[in-house]
Amino acid sequence: DIAYVKNTVGFYRRELDAVLARKKRAKSSSGTVIPGFVPDPAKTFNRGFTDFGLKGPTAGWSSPGTPKSLGERIGTVAKAAKDYFTLTGPHDLANGDGICFFDARGELRGSVVNSVANDRVYPDKTGGLTAGAVIYRNHDRAFLKTLTAKTSCERRIAVSFVLSGT
């Protein structure tokens, strides 16, 4: 998945560059990569994060709820109606975004946002959605469109040369 690779590599490149800058070191390759987006690992395939083993033995490092990607946490459902829901706080959900949540039985359910009007989100399915459920966005349409654009990433390599007449 090209979007996952671009996002993940972009994130780690940014983190490595920050570490190198703090330690006054340089990478072995030449050039600079300029992503046309802000890398965010929660926006592409993601099963959560762990610091497994970094601070000693670790318990509870798995994702017992589902082996699937939940995506980024968007908010908590304030009201669940027959064909829409509202969230307790601000959000940027948009038409075409994929969302998921755990129902009252702990089963993962998913839907696609058909439209957003004012504070109401109209998904294609609302079955099992209740107030208090946490909504995750597992498909950010706008972010993925940015990642898959031909201009989403640029690499620049400095060149130095001398011109002289013959």
Q: Which functions belong to the PLM regions below?
A:
Residues 1-166:
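Surface-exposed amphipathic alpha-helical tracts and adjacent flexible/coil segments at the periphery
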